[in-house]
Amino acid sequence: MTENFFEKTLAAREIAEIPGMLEFDIPVHGDNRGWFKENFQKEKMLPLVFPNSFFSEDKLQNNVSFSRKNVLRGLHAEPWDKYISVADNGRVLGAWVDLREGESFGNVYQTEIDASKGIFVPRGVANGFQVLSDVVAYSYLVNDYWALELKPKYAFV
């Protein structure tokens, strides 16, 4: 966990290197039993510039991958937007590459993610991470359904 794990208020900032990408501070509440976080609530996120278009097709799927220390996953670029976060005490170094045509093509952004941070990744931006902690539960909310027949549309860089 980062030093400011329990001190954040819900906030968002745009990532200058990759247009449309957003980084969120997520409040985490802890006591002697452990901790709790509200990972995502649409009504609270929309006023913070979370794109309403994320919900336009009425499809939502939440996935969680579990990985061990030093595992490197990615880079994946699927045909959907995603909101990613860490769901446990783990930490990752997240990395993104803009694969969309235009001035930001090839731009890269990296940051460390723990449970107190969320990232909105627009479609066309490749997403990957390396596990820094012993284990991690990496959660991603996407706005389309994964299907084997669509796998040719997915890019693995």
Regions found by a protein language model. Give the residues of each.
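Conserved metal-binding segment of the jelly-roll/cupin
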Residues: 112-134
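Non-catalytic, conserved peripheral segments adjacent to functional cores
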Residues: 2-113, 133-135, 142-157
